[in-house]
Amino acid sequence: IAGLNGVENMRSLSRNGFSQVTVIFKESSNLYFMRQQVTERLAQARPNLPAGVEPQMGPVSTGLGEVFHYSVEYEFPDGKGAKVKDGEPGWQSDGSFLTERGERLTDRVSKLAYLRTVQDWIIRPQLRTTAGVADVDSLGGYVKQFVVEPDAAKMAAYGISFEELAQALEDANLSVGANFIRRSGESYLVRADARIKSADEIARAVIAQRQGVPITVGQVANINVGGELRSGAASRNGYETVVGSALMLVGANSRTVAQAVGDKLEEIKKTLPPGVVIVPTLNRSQLVMATIKTVAKNLVEGAALVVVILFALLGNWRAAVIA
């Protein structure tokens, strides 16, 4: 990247598990052409990076691009004030939360992971289609993970190695095409979607066979819902939540973009699962409108003050207004 034409300055910030490189180009440089050049250089550097490291570029936005913040939270935090109907989606009498897919969330991590899943897979994709929005950031909660805890004694008893277990988990989470089948002059596409959606599906994944009997993951390991290690959190009114931030495209109008985001969120609310709500916390358009009203008020007051001063000096209202 240092050899790119037009680079004026570079700086980096490195922390545990995170590294950020900022490249500053000349003011006259074309933004999109420079991004293309950086993308090509990142592709060249990718083979030299450690396994599992995937470099990404930031959105086409600036440090002042955050025009709308919102909170994704439970309608009744910790179930306080909620109408409990056991067996139906929502809070249960035992303090757990039942999702519309029938998944029971019993601990803090799984409940926050559910909010993050709603933000990343339901709200964010829809909000990114709004005109003028460069990207949508997520903060707080936990990125959902399925935690597999092998039992060494059971694995030894079945003669299962850790490599076999890892390979079985990888094979059980694939989505592949199987070409097509022709029948009566028609073609039918065949696709095998084996991507994991629940802990039960992981437990049923077959590792190997012993004397013709399949050995599943659930027989040699415990599977739980967990969260990816995080370096930050978000809260509102004393309860942990997930915060979303809409980033404005460079050169866009902050007032119109913020209004469009607010309107889009009203549409998205209809697609949320039961018990989850969106609460706007920052709307840049409100700040802009308040500023415009303040400027207009100051102009009117200033004009009136000038007229009064001119009248005091000239002693004639008509002359003061004309002047």
Show where each model-derived region lies.
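Membrane-proximal extracytoplasmic
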Residues: 1-307, 312-313
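Membrane-water interface of transmembrane alpha-helices in multipass transporters/channels
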Residues: 281, 316-323
